[in-house]
Amino acid sequence: MSKTSIGLDKVQSAELADKLNELLATYQVFYTNVRGYHWNIKGVNFFALHAKFEEIYTNLVARVDEVAERILTLGYTPNNAYSQYLKISRIKEDIAVSEAQECLSGTLQGLKTLLDQQREILAFANNANDEGTASQMSDYIKEQEKLVWMFQAACQTCHN
């Protein structure tokens, strides 16, 4: 069995890097969507939502960098072209969204998509004995589960 420079199985690491590149794409498209919500939100809840979306997209920028660096740590190259991201992202571009309910719903659905994808990667990383990736995914999942709860609550009482 051939090993990577950090002692992981090369075949499993290559597959994990592919999964992480798909996650990177999902994060990048979600980031762009949330940035658009921040710019274009309208309505009575503008100030609160404008600030919340900025908080979220700022966090997403950090996650993008961390996922890309994990791919590099595994010995592979992160995708860096937006055209690649659009092909493999599990989230599609959200175009011309400005109503609060749509922005909240888009954010909630994006978070749920990330959770599903990260849980798949967590399971694969655990099977590959990749504690670094597993720990990273576990941290993201914990953080995003709380955000899902908050956005579900916000979607129930949203005013357009």
From Swiss-Prot:
Q: GO terms for molecular function, please?
A: ferric iron binding; oxidoreductase activity, acting on metal ions
A Pfam family that the UniProt record links to this protein:
Ferritin
InterPro entries recorded for this chain? DPS_DNA-bd (IPR002177), DPS_DNA-bd_CS (IPR023188), Ferritin-like (IPR012347), Ferritin-like_SF (IPR009078), Ferritin_DPS_dom (IPR008331)
- What are the boundaries of the signal sequence? none
Checking SUPFAM superfamilies in the record gives:
Ferritin-like
Regarding protein family, the annotation reads: Belongs to the Dps family.
**Name of protein:** Uncharacterized protein HI_1349
